[in-house]
């Protein structure tokens, strides 16, 4: 037996010694010193005292649950047996004295309430019997009185009420007295009540209430055992509105007929019928403009709420936070000018690279974006094409730029694309720095350039204007430093600012479809910082930036303001000029992209339908145009747009070009099938066909051509259209003879003696006989003689005799005109 002292016990139970001694004294132990020994029995006594003082008692189990499991076998068809296991569980609860006392009180209250209810019921029954007795006596007195012959006997209340009373009386006799229900009955009723649908509590009514004839006819019927039952009426009813329902109809910039009808809660046929009455035939999927839809909705009596179609985009713009300190950024400079004036060569010298030699035909066909570190700071350059077909590219270049370098060749002067570049720069409000190139040539004439540009309102600084003119030579490298100095001086004047800490924003310069990497977009970051992994929204496309490359193809992690980069990860190739912005989450980007796609589709459908309606009467009675169908594939989006724009301008009233399919990337099997189905020519601009496409082209004999210079495509298409035009029949007047006398011949009839006054008269050629310059006969020259000899031709100033086949009414003074018909090839 282990013995411990009071001190050791206090240490074990983590209690002060004085407190433990006090508790031991309260337990009836005689310990008063910390060194005294405590036995096990004394410990048990102390523990029992502490438990009783704290209220802990050894509780007996209050709930016992019994489970029973029985297994049986069920035989089914096909001599199969199924084992069925039935489990039952029963729980017995031992209630405390307090609960038993409360239960007794509830039973007593229930008995008192039941006795009170019985008393009220007895009083009500006695009262009812007294009323019935009074009614019976009144009915008997009425029946004994003499009734008029015309009035029929009453058959409602006495006839119906008396038998019912008898039946109820018999029921009362047989009905046993109600006993107080046991706990088991109440529990069972509560269990059933959980599974029964809740019914409305009916108001207390007298047991035998007389029914009227209306009640009998309206849903009441007699049951088989004399019980009154009510028919269930589960019929659904619709109550028409008291007045017309006025709805709020939200109308955007465009809305289809079906959507408008749905918002007004009417059938689309009613809207179409109304539009027909207004004189506008429409279909269910036709797009209406905002004014027309507003007029229709107001005519139907609804309230119109005009909403902006750009609400979703405005919310997106508001959600983006562009906070941070604005800092100076590098200028974006666009090099513009006429073709072959040396734009790319000038940029090459600045970049110390040879780009122009790599361009097909020596002309730029894409917008190139580069940033260059100079001694005076960083400058971003955009190189635009100068050919007329690249008008849209130059316009985009001017839109994204801060300063324009206008390159003009000193030996060539101001050309059409030079004028166009000036117009784009002025429309964008961008300052112009003129670089007079090719100053190393002996025929250079810079004064001619100044005069030509002054006529376009580009006044040199030395003439009091604001456009610096810098003579340069891209070949020799002279004047390049002065040109960069002039550009950076203009940039300082503009005070260009950007916020590097904000989310990235920019513009798409170019896009293409790379076979290994998917859609690739060249983006110029204009504000903020674009980072790898950002979710970007670009026009109708979106995606997460998987990788970013600089202009040399090296991967980078982020790009600040004025930096051009190539981004990978978009779901499609965006159009050049589309705005790029970094958004917070993919869901918002997808919503806006899908909204823009739907909006673009609706506008396109509306434009196409309007064009059809406008041209429907113009095309009536005209022959169908001959169409040259083309499937066009290009390497980048900008070149594709330039080609489509150039080809669409070719043609006239008889022939036209239709680009049935276009895209970025190589020629695929689906492109070849499209060309086969539409009888089109396949053109590839800087792209090639894959094996599947080549197989279809060879087997079906399709016309497929590759090009790398835009001039060649345009020239070939012009030739093809010229061949489709056919040829014109033109009449050439060979000679004219004047009739001086008329002779009679037994063989030819009337023979005209003539003098050739113009050209040469030939035999067996068609002729016209003119009298007072009016054609009176057209036929063939049958006989031509000079001095009684048949000749083949008679020249100017000679006399001859002319016999006209099947015509004898020749008179003196008539003119005989000899002509020929020639087929001449037509041109556009």
Curated annotation (Swiss-Prot):
Residues 222-235 have a biased composition (Basic residues). InterPro entries: DNA-bd_dom_put_sf, EF-G-like_DII, IF2_assoc_dom_bac, IF2_II, IF2_N, P-loop_NTPase, Small_GTP-bd, T_Tr_GTP-bd_dom. GO terms for molecular function: GTP binding; GTPase activity; translation initiation factor activity. Residues 95-136, 166-188, 212-221 have a biased composition (Basic and acidic residues). Residues 93-240 are annotated as: Disordered. GO terms for cellular component: cytosol. Residues 383-386 are annotated as: G3. Transmembrane segments: none annotated. Residues 337-344 are annotated as: G1. PROSITE patterns: G_TR_2 (PS51722), IF2 (PS01176). Belongs to the TRAFAC class translation factor GTPase superfamily. Classic translation factor GTPase family. IF-2 subfamily. One of the essential components for the initiation of protein synthesis. Protects formylmethionyl-tRNA from spontaneous hydrolysis and promotes its binding to the 30S ribosomal subunits. Also involved in the hydrolysis of GTP during the formation of the 70S ribosomal complex. This is Translation initiation factor IF-2. It comes from Ectopseudomonas mendocina (strain ymp). The lineage of its organism: Bacteria, Pseudomonadati, Pseudomonadota, Gammaproteobacteria, Pseudomonadales. The gene is infB.
